[in-house]
From Swiss-Prot:
Keywords: Ribonucleoprotein, Ribosomal protein. GO terms for biological process: translation. It holds the Pfam family Ribosomal_S9. Belongs to the universal ribosomal protein uS9 family. It comes from Pseudomonas syringae pv. tomato (strain ATCC BAA-871 / DC3000). It comes from the Bacteria. InterPro entries: Ribosomal_Su5_D2-typ_SF, Ribosomal_uS9, Ribosomal_uS9_bac/plastid, Ribosomal_uS9_CS, Ribsml_uS5_D2-typ_fold_subgr. Gene3D superfamilies: 3.30.230.10. The gene is rpsI. This is Small ribosomal subunit protein uS9.
Length: 130
């Protein structure tokens, strides 16, 4: 891999994002679509930009992302995690600030499986005493 780009893999819930940072002007491309086009929700766009705004590198990189699996929230979280890892590969001194903001840690919360005899993972059928 060339030294002109940095790579990071991000995961959240069932979503996986492959993130490439290249020197540029701040364009963010997700699955060959713009950030605004890919995410309809403003909160998802904000989540994706968080590590860049924290490290003040918004205008410094062009970001190319391939993301698969999950929903809107999971994909946004996976992209944020991938951008964070790529930024740390670019400059290790950013790790402290990113760690303090909580972007470095992989959010390990997953959907709990449905159990036999229950309606959902924990919801039980109504109990009848008589």
């Amino acid at each position: 891999m060339s030294a002109t780009q940095n790579y990071g893999t991000g995961r959240r819930k069932t979503a996986t994002a492959r993130v490439f940072l290249r020197p540029g002007t701040g364009n963010i491309s997700i699955n060959n679509r713009s950030l605004d086009n890919f995410f309809g929700r403003e909160t998802a766009r904000m989540v994706v930009r968080q590590p860049l705004e924290l490290t003040e590198t918004v205008e410094k990189f062009d970001i190319y992302v391939t993301v698969i699996g999950g929903g809107v929230s999971g994909q946004a979280g996976a992209i944020r995690h991938g951008i964070t890892r790529a930024l740390m590969q670019y400059d290790e001194t950013l790790r402290g600030a990113l760690r303090k903001a909580g972007f470095v840690t992989r959010d390990a919360r997953e959907v709990e499986r449905k159990k036999v005899g229950l309606r959902k993972a924990r919801k039980r059928p109504q109990y009848s005493k008589r």
